[in-house]
Amino acid sequence: MAANGSPLSATGDYGAKTSREAAQTARRTTRAGPEPFGDPLSGILLVAEPAAGAANARVVDALRRSLATVKLVEAYVTWIHSDLLEEILSLEPGALVAVGPAAARAIDSLDYPLARMAFSEVPEGSWFAWTKGASGLRLPALAPALEDEDAKRHFWRAFLALRALAPEEAAGRL
């Protein structure tokens, strides 16, 4: 029951459960990277590899700007950490994106029980069926793209695959 006495909808129940589990995981987790950002209920989860030292702030800023460019500002971004499996299980994303080879290896090492394909086995920038209900996308590392023009072009070519998840794009496919 909601606080006003009316019954909760199934969507409301699920949203509350997922929000609570994500908050519990975040409180318990010792993170090596920056704080996660975005909406954990967006259905889009990016797992990024932290950059070395002060470059973390630049990577966070670049990810925020890049997501805004493809109209996915609500996508949830987290970093490689010890409770990543629990976080993925609680969020149940429809799209899971590995940003960088270390993120791809970290996801693969979780031995996710329903995974059909390993992130490390797919080409960068190509969507694949990660589980029956979730798509996966592997991207190059972002930190090198902040320093090198060729790496930047390579990152962007792969990153633009995320446009398929933008609300206008999704509506256009219906």
What are these model-derived regions, one by one?
Residues M1-L174:
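A polyanion-binding, active-site-adjacent surface
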